Amino acid sequence: MAEHSPATEIRSNAERQVLFLQGPLSPLYKLTGDRLEALGFGVHRINFCAGDWLHWHGKGCVSFKRRPTEWPAFIEDYLRTHGITDLVLHGDQRLYHRVAIEKAIQQDVYVAVTELGALRPGWMTLERNGLSTLSHFPSDPVSIMRIAEAAGQVDLTPKYPSSFWLQTAPDVVYNLTNVFLKPLFPAYQRHTIYPPIQEYLRGAVRLLKEKRRNQAAEHLLASLREKAVRYYVLPLQLEGDFQLRRHSPFDSFEQVLEIVFQSLAEEAPEDVHIVLKSHPLDVGFEDWPGVSKRLADRFGVGDRVHFLDGGGLAKPFEEALGVVTLNSTAGLEALQAGLPVKTLVPAHYDIADLTHQGDLATFWHDPVYPDTDLLSAYIQALAASTQVRGSIHNAEGVVVAADNIARKVAIRDLNSFGSYVDPPPRLARARALGVPL
């Protein structure tokens, strides 16, 4: 077969028009767009707020300043009139992104969705059409084993450690820009739920108390160990997390606590306890220690519920009997630590022989441990098909991520090795549980 000349490749690429919507708070999308443009692709960007504009403006960029109700007609027309062939966006559940994906699929546009990596640190997620419950990655063990075998060994060596400043500074700059320049984009509907300035003030106070919180967490774990307490871990999730708001039937994590505490009271052995682990990015709007104490007392398990507000997950996992989670990526960490995991709604890793498929009542008494061969295959298959190397929280990592995303989009190699299953294999089960998708 004759090789394609560079000129032929450029002409072929020039027929493709790539539209970028909101990206993560980093230079990632601008860098990715630059790489695609260098390959001859037409590159477009729609900005929705001043923070978006700050990250990327100039050639190929337009601003959407109309009301959100006008977005469906706008994006439908934009896709058609500009001949868009590929759509790239970060997260699939933001209002503007949900609509754009729907309109893009209707026009046979290739949709690439990015998110922070499932195998953090040092990875980014890149999937076709949807994430989490809407992921097209298979959920049956046979297919996963087949993908892992086809992909071969993937280098999982940790790379690109996160920088505190690259996590925090871009977030602060982006959101404060939106606050002070809101008159330029008065109709913009943000996807976060907390006022940014209040969130940063609370976060600063929490950071000042971090050493004290970590010490308290160590003392609590030492006390539980000394008393030989048998406990499960329940990692809390953020109220603003789309995993809760869109990929579960719940409006608040308080409802999750009610379900778990009631089951603990009525169905678990009397010597089983729960350790709640706060989310590392929670700044305290909800007062989860107070909420959990009130609920635990209501269900009569106040002496069996403990709140851990510091440290990571590795230490509490060491002595845990297992992990109960809504659908957090912490569940995958628990599986990698060899712990049984029960998800309350379908998570990406909620797969037969990996997670406990029975109800909470059976989980308390006889939790199913993950099959180590399947877990290894799942991680290899995931890394090879829906993850790319790189990180937005590392200066070198963001460049690597841009290179890898641009390469994958250019050759349309998302969900590779046969890892695209339609319809999304987790969706029917999620809808049966009341997930609003």
Predicted feature locations:
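N-terminal subdomain of nucleotide-sugar transferases
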Residues: 1-49
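Structural motif
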Residues: 17, 85-86, 231, 273, ...
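A donor-sugar binding/catalytic signature common to diverse glycosyltransferases
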Residues: 86-92, 96, 309-355
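Active-site and donor-binding regions of nucleotide-sugar-utilizing enzymes
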Residues: 25-31, 48-144
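Leloir-type glycosyltransferase catalytic cores
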Residues: 137-182, 354-437
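Donor nucleotide-activated moiety binding/catalytic core segment of transferases
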Residues: 66-80, 280, 285-330, 336
